[in-house]
């Protein structure tokens, strides 16, 4: 049977429709048809006829004589196309990207025979060459070009990208100079100079500070050159702000040779000198510190550069980098976000093993978190501490996370310096063209162990035998230039001697200085702010606001647009707010919160609120964004204050986040770090879930100022309260936050009135310094009939760290009960029921810093009190009890609460309420 007989039934109209779809979007049709039409384009050119005419002609020629030359030619054109597509898809598996050894054999065959061609076809000219940017040429030349494009020192993965235009751009970009960058003699010498700086810097430290940890870059020295060329090119492309995050590996080298940190300061850190700062600053190890620098390109363009400080917890800084970048885009680059460039440098083991990488990568296309694309660079040592890569990932490459969001990957041999720079420039071009993420897999090695005092041959003796014989990238590149006749060895020696002399001079100067100087990070953004003293943190702050202004804001917040349709429940929410505010003068929690934001917006501050479900609020109390019934158009009254009512100067941003605590909290920490005039808030869905971000709390939020001399005003709203919902929906782990409190590092509050919450939020922006603020927010109090404030309370009041009991006769009080948060209302209800006027209930609204002087005044009021109690609903080993035990010694007091439990709460509602009521009863015994 004729194997082409099926073509007799071909419908010209069907071909035409399918071809139209192919032209519109090649990815929309079945892959085999896509391959057919790629070849058909060539055939159409050959016949010089429209598709409707060409199809019957081709079908007739194929059917009438299988052996005739035109049909053979067409069939082989298809085979060449298949070969080209195979190289595009699998060529990276055959690249020469390992500087230590040839790659292990891959289960891929890109021979011409595999695709139905033979050596007899090598000199046949094929039109398919146009697919790789060539004129019609021989198969021999096509194969040679394919090997240059896809199988040399740079391997590219991109065929999984769904957008055809992106793949086509990559194809065209690769075809320029056969996937290389042409370098002038000047560029090559500049490249050699940067390699020399990278190598000589490490050699200098290795000899001057023997055995000290520095986490050498050696084996991936070309990172410095790649970054240097990328920064220069970025400035030329209009980038004005660059934010870089990286771990310890090679950090000192990047600080010195990319960011221009004075080696003198690095040497001071190696010498272990004390800091010039006072006791409120403890500092950090040298390979964690950040820097802000301004670099001027060779053509005079300036670029603000920031290397973000970070802890040893790998990959955490990635989310922080994204947040800082977004803040800079919102402030400086509203016209073009691509002017701010985030770069994240990963380790090969960490990028595979740390889940925050996935959380951060998922942000790249989300409207509340996207930053116009991030350049990810994996410094691939082929080993993680002592663990071989075969034990640290299941994927072929360390960069396979890139496929989650259709990011291209460039795998590059770190010994090929020109290929490295080419890959870095390629990545920059891609990011600026599409505003999407791109990954570079910089495959090198680690010359020493994990640190310079570690013995790597315990675990990788074979690899380190190879490394011991391997020359460094500088010498390899220098020899290449010598072979090309561009330089002589004397130039290399001169470079090395000059740079060493420079470092020697800095070392001599450094050793004359008694102290280490830590320069401020992002000083431009933080001009006018100061480090707060303990007394300043407890000073009252004026948070009043004109009542008329508040009234106008309330009017905007309670008026639905008449020309929009909303579901009845939305109408009721807004109507109830209007009635409560203007008829009853009852401001509930949700309304007070929105008024706080609105008031700050009118004063020129910005507000950013993110977290899971924050637009509506987990407990349906906020409704900051309303949706129309028919189109789901978003209506945000707080944005209308600026854009429709011209009442506000600042912008209001509120975004439902991806379902992430760790990554999103890190992002918001970064945002607040770069935007001190923005009230930056992260709300947990339930406070219980905030411990999913524990690393961010422990390593950044609680101690960033103490370690890195950076302030951060991030607000965390953590719903907390025991209401019978079980162990996972009751406790924000108050005890853990209080355990982190020391040296004036943050505020911790547990408010009980809408007005106090209102003033607390305003205070966060009104101080001349910034501290993180942790607020344990209520759940049941959101609609509690007693939890209301008046408009006057908001306009005229201030934040009250302690709320004394307004009991009529303080002289009658025999027992003073201190408590915090929603538990107060349970105690209050019981006291009212019992008619006990001998017991005063004192609310501590700010737990840290503890307002000791105010507490003294409160205690002094109750001159006849002999019994002092700390009461809490949390178990004894949780809540604020342990903290109060350490810090509250004004009077001798006793604990009333449940005993210690392993879980925060019982899963049985009956048991939970029984325990709860027993505590209340004990308070009034």
Task: Locate the predicted segments by residue.
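Active-site cores of enzymes that catalyze phosphoryl transfer or operate on phosphate-rich substrates
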Residues: 179-201, 272-322, 326-333, 637, ...
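Extended, charge-enriched "interface" segments that sit outside catalytic cores
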Residues: 40-222, 239
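Cofactor-binding active-site loop characterized by glycine-rich and histidine/acidic residues
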Residues: 240-406, 410, 619-676
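Alpha-helix capping and helix-loop boundary segments enriched in small/acidic/polar residues
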Residues: 6-9, 71, 214-221, 304-315, ...
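Conserved phosphate-handling catalytic cores of large alpha/beta enzymes
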Residues: 384-395, 403-439, 443-449, 457
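Subset of Sec-pathway N-terminal targeting signals
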Residues: 1-40, 44
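Flexible, glycine-rich loop/tail regions that form catalytic "lids" or insertion modules at the edges
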Residues: 75-85, 92-127, 144, 199, ...
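Active-site pocket-lining segments that scaffold enzyme catalytic pockets across diverse folds
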Residues: 200, 204-264, 579, 587-601, ...
């Amino acid at each position: 049977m004729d194997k082409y007989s099926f073509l007799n039934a071909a419908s010209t109209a069907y071909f035409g429709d399918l071809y139209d779809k192919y032209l519109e979007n090649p990815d929309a049709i079945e892959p085999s048809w896509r391959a057919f039409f790629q070849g058909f384009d060539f055939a159409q050119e050959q016949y010089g006829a429209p598709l409707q005419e060409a199809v019957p002609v081709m079908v007739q020629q194929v059917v009438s004589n299988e052996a005739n030359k035109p049909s053979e030619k067409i069939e082989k054109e298809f085979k060449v196309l298949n070969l080209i597509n195979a190289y595009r898809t699998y060529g990276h598996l055959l690249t020469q990207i390992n500087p230590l050894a040839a790659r292990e054999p891959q289960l891929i065959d890109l021979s011409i025979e595999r695709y139905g061609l033979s050596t007899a076809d090598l000199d046949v000219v094929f039109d398919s060459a146009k697919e790789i940017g060539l004129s019609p040429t021989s198969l021999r030349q096509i194969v040679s070009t394919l090997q240059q494009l896809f199988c040399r020192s740079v391997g590219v993965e991109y065929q999984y990208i769904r957008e055809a235009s992106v793949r086509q751009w990559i194809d065209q970009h690769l075809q320029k100079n056969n996937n290389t960058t042409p370098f002038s003699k000047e560029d090559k010498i500049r490249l050699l100079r940067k390699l020399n700086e990278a190598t000589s810097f490490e050699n200098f430290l290795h000899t001057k500070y023997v055995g000290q940890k520095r986490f050498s870059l050696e084996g991936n020295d070309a990172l410095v050159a790649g970054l240097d060329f990328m920064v220069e090119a970025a400035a030329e492309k209009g980038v004005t702000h660059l934010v870089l995050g990286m771990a310890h590996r090679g950090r000192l080298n990047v600080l010195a040779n990319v960011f221009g940190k004075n080696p003198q300061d690095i040497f001071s850190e190696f010498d272990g000198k004390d800091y010039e700062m006072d006791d409120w600053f403890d500092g950090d190890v040298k390979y964690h510190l950040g820097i802000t620098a301004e670099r001027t390109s060779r053509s005079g363009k300036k670029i603000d550069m920031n290397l973000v400080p970070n802890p040893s917890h790998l990959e955490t800084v990635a989310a922080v980098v994204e947040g800082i970048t977004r803040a800079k885009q919102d402030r400086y680059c509203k016209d073009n976000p691509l002017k701010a460039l985030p770069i994240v440098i990963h380790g090969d083991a960490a990028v595979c093993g740390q889940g925050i990488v996935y959380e951060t990568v998922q942000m790249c296309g989300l409207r509340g978190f996207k930053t116009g694309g991030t350049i990810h660079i994996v410094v691939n040592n082929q080993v993680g501490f002592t663990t071989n890569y075969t034990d640290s990932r299941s994927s072929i490459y360390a960069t396979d996370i890139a496929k989650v969001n259709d990011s291209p990957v460039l795998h590059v041999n770190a010994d090929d310096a020109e290929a490295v720079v080419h890959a870095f420039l390629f990545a920059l071009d891609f990011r600026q063209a599409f505003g999407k993420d791109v990954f570079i897999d910089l495959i090198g090695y680690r010359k020493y162990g994990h640190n310079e005092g570690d013995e790597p041959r315990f675990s990788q003796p074979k690899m380190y035998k190879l490394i011991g014989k391997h020359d460094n990238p500088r010498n390899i590149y220098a020899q290449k230039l010598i072979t090309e006749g561009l330089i002589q060895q004397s130039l290399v020696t001169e470079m090395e001697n000059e740079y060493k002399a420079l470092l020697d001079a800095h070392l001599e100067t450094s050793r004359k200085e008694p102290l280490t100087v830590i320069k401020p990070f992002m000083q431009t953004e933080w001009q006018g702010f100061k480090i707060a003293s303990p007394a300043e943190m407890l000073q009252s702050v004026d948070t009043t606001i004109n009542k008329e202004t508040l009234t106008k804001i309330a009017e905007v917040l309670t008026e639905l647009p008449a020309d929009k349709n909303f579901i009845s429940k939305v109408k009721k929410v807004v109507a109830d707010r209007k009635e409560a505010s203007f008829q009853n003068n009852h401001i509930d929690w949700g309304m007070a919160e929105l008024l706080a934001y609105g008031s700050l917006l009118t004063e020129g501050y910005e507000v950013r609120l993110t977290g899971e479900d924050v637009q509506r609020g987990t407990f349906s109390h906020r409704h900051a964004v309303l949706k129309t019934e028919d189109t789901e158009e978003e209506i945000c009254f707080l944005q209308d204050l600026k854009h429709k009512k011209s009442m506000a100067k600042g912008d209001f941003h509120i975004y439902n986040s991806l379902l992430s605590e760790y990554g999103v909290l890190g992002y918001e920490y970064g945002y607040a770090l770069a935007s001190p005039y923005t009230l930056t808030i992260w709300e947990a869905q339930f406070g219980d879930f905030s411990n999913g971000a524990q690393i961010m709390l422990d390593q950044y939020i609680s101690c960033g100022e103490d370690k890195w001399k950076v302030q951060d005003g991030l607000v965390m709203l953590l719903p907390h309260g025991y209401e019978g919902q079980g162990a996972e929906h009751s406790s924000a782990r108050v005890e853990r936050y209080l355990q982190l409190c020391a040296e004036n590092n943050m505020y911790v509050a547990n408010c009980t009135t809408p007005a106090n919450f209102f003033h607390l939020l305003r205070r966060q922006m009104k101080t001349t310094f910034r501290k993180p603020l942790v607020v344990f927010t209520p759940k049941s109090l959101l609609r509690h009939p007693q939890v209301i404030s008046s408009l006057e309370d908001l306009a005229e009041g201030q934040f009250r760290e302690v709320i004394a009991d307004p009991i009529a006769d303080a002289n009658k009080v025999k027992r003073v009960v201190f408590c915090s948060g929603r538990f107060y209302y349970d105690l209050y209800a019981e006291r009212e029921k019992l008619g006990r006027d001998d017991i005063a209930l004192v609310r501590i609204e700010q737990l840290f810093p503890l307002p000791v002087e105010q507490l003294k005044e409160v205690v002094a009021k109750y001159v006849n009190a002999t019994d002092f109690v700390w009461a809490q609903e949390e178990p004894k080993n949780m809540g604020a009890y342990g903290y109060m035990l350490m810090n509250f010694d004004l009077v001798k007091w006793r604990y009333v609460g449940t005993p210690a439990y392993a879980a925060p709460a019982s899963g049985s509602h009956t048991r939970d309420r029984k325990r709860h009521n027993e505590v209340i009863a004990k308070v009034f015994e």
